[in-house]
Amino acid sequence: LYLRFPLSLRLVEEMLLERGVVVSYETVRRWALKFGPAYARRLRRKTPSRRDIWHLDEVVVTIAGQKHWLWRAVDQDGYVLDEVVQTRRNTAAAKRLLRRLLRKQGCPPRRMITDKLGSYAAAQRQVMPTVEHRSHKGLKGLSNRAENSHLPLRRREPVTQGFRSPRYLQRFVSVFSAVRNLFVPSHSGRSASATHLHRLNAMAEWKVAANVAA
């Protein structure tokens, strides 16, 4: 529940109590930290090949009063490819994200779409010089796919009352995005019935990954 829905630890505690399971919210937190990474690894092993357009964006996150940046890449379906918490919003930070992406994806994309931040262009020229790069400067909405990918995390922030450290945030998004990716339809523009079927299949896969009895 905590990994899938924007629920606080205390709300999960109350929902479990309603089902006859008596645990504290602190126990729920420990469960998420202990089992979440294993669930994410199982889900990633079944991840299909992603598509060939990368949308990149960065969003500011305040941790213990200090400004940090969460750099994220998604494909054209909105599937999160990778994300990394960094203290800088510069070329070095952009290069780190691109290198992580190349290592994890195994090959460069056909096209890379970003906002107008100059660090992306500088990093692209050094790390992926043959990849087509488009900036949405003057092309309103071109990078909305990446910008919209921040919304699920933004909805979680008030519930979690902030993140206690960069390491905690990195661990959280690693698991949170792996779970969320499972429920993202593979192609845009699906019918309602196809989307419903996708969700049923995703829930079945989630139960297998989490070792939940049917």
Predicted regions and their residues:
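Short, basic alpha-helical nucleic acid-contact segments in DNA-binding proteins
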Residues: 7, 22, 30-52
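DNA-recognition alpha helix
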Residues: 9-21
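Two-metal-ion RNase H-like nuclease active-site motif
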Residues: 50-63
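Helix-centered, glycine/charged polyanion-binding patches within enzymatic domains
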Residues: 116-174, 184-185, 189
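Mobile genetic element proteins and their domesticated derivatives, centered on retroelements
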Residues: 12, 28, 57, 73, ...
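C-terminal domain-tail junction helix/linker
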Residues: 159-161, 170-214
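Short conserved beta-strand segments at catalytic cores or DNA/RNA-binding microdomains
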Residues: 3-6, 64-80, 98
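Active-site beta-loop-alpha junctions of metal-dependent nucleic acid enzymes
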Residues: 30, 34, 83-106
